[in-house]
């Protein structure tokens, strides 16, 4: 059985780590370099760095900060936020990131997935999908620009398309559950896991050990969390000990 991964998210705004609830009410959570080092020490398998306002503000990612964090880490480090071209993605890899993720730019130009996977390798291209459930149709729609713009893309169909175009992994965030700490959106995650063969990272809503157990049992390859680590509710090691007890294969 493949090892399940625990991923810590660093949402960056103005050079600081922040955390919101359902993509709003942002509050400060600390220094990114210090937190990255701490999370690695605490047993996290990967770190995802998201410059949360780069896309909205139409500016480039904070490269100096990426370099600074990359220097300190030995675990895989994925970076995204506002990346629009293959050149920018290559630049971020040169700064020390292991993988890059794209979101809004992939929706606007799906060919970017194809081009980037050819140049930096499919396994280094992650497509992030921010999705929200439509109450009337019960369908999940893709949102872009930090969750501020609704598209008419069905999230499950878009996930399939991303795989076809060469994405190596999907980072799926449910906007309905983000930051609420009441559990991952199992319905959305399962629909996407069943639709694709590439790894799926579930994101949005982790609050306790049971949430990780649930999401791994429906087939997620990795589970991303932010609030529970930032506010010291659990360390990755605590989590993994509990997961191991119920037979989930994790790296201790």
Swiss-Prot record:
Source organism superkingdom: Bacteria
Enzyme class label: lyase
InterPro entries cross-referenced by the UniProt entry: Aldolase_TIM (IPR013785), His_biosynth (IPR006062), HisF (IPR004651), IGPS_HisA/HisF (IPR050064), RibuloseP-bd_barrel (IPR011060)
Subcellular location: Cytoplasm
Transmembrane segments: none
Job of this protein: IGPS catalyzes the conversion of PRFAR and glutamine to IGP, AICAR and glutamate. The HisF subunit catalyzes the cyclization activity that produces IGP and AICAR from PRFAR using the ammonia provided by the HisH subunit.
Family, similarity comment: Belongs to the HisA/HisF family.
The protein's name in its UniProt record: Imidazole glycerol phosphate synthase subunit HisF
Annotated source species: Petrotoga mobilis (strain DSM 10674 / SJ95)
Gene name, Swiss-Prot/TrEMBL: hisF
């Amino acid at each position: 059985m493949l090892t399940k991964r625990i991923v810590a998210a660093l949402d960056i705004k103005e050079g600081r780590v922040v955390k919101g609830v359902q993509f709003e009410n942002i509050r400060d959570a600390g220094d990114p370099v210090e937190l990255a080092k701490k999370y690695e020490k605490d047993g996290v398998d990967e770190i995802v760095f998201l410059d949360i306002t780069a896309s909205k503000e139409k500016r480039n990612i904070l490269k100096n900060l990426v370099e600074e964090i990359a220097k300190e880490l030995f675990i895989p480090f994925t970076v995204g936020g506002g990346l629009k071209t293959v050149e920018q993605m290559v630049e971020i890899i040169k700064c020390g990131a292991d993988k890059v993720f794209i979101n809004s730019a992939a929706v606007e130009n799906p060919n970017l997935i194809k081009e980037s996977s050819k140049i930096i390798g499919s396994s280094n291209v992650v497509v992030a999908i921010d999705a929200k459930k439509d109450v009337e149709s019960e369908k999940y729609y893709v949102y872009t620009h930090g969750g501020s713009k609704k598209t008419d893309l069905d999230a499950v169909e878009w996930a399939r398309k991303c795989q076809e175009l060469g994405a190596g992994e999907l980072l799926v965030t449910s906007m309905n559950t983000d930051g609420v700490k009441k559990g991952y959106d199992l319905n959305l995650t399962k629909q996407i896991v069943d639709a694709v063969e590439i790894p799926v990272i579930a994101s949005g809503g982790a609050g306790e050990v049971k949430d990780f157990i649930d999401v791994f049992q429906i087939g997620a390859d990795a589970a991303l969390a932010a609030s529970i680590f930032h506010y010291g509710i659990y360390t990755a090691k605590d989590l993994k000990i509990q997961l191991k007890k119920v037979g989930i294969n994790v790296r201790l």
